[in-house]
């Protein structure tokens, strides 16, 4: 259970960064070779700094109007963890508001720097 708590701590720090603009320690949440991909596995960010910057950019430039999560699942095996969830969000940027929903799949690994996100896949459900 202590292992699961350590994984959840990293997930909570990442969540606090984009939702509460609490960026302290965000970079440490990502492995140096972390990758974020989207639909069709298009690469959005690669490397610790770029992944952290993507969260800072969204938190700084988008106003989240509504957000909810469901279907949480966390599985931990020795030094690997997979966390998945579904989400719905409405947010505002300069171009206007946008409503999206989808799922996230996060893979974390336990290394010399503790638990870190190594891979994130973001799926956006097709617009209805």
Feature map (PLM): residue ranges:
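Hydrophobic/aromatic beta-strand elements that line small-molecule binding cavities or substrate pockets
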Residues: 55, 69-74, 87-89, 103-109
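Short, well-ordered beta-strand segments in beta-rich or mixed alpha/beta enzyme
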Residues: 14, 36, 81-91
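Short beta-strand segments enriched in hydrophobic/aromatic residues
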Residues: 30, 87-89, 121-124
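Short helix-adjacent coil turns
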Residues: 14, 20-22
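Short, cysteine-centered beta-strand-loop-beta hairpins and adjacent loop/turn segments enriched
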Residues: 89-99
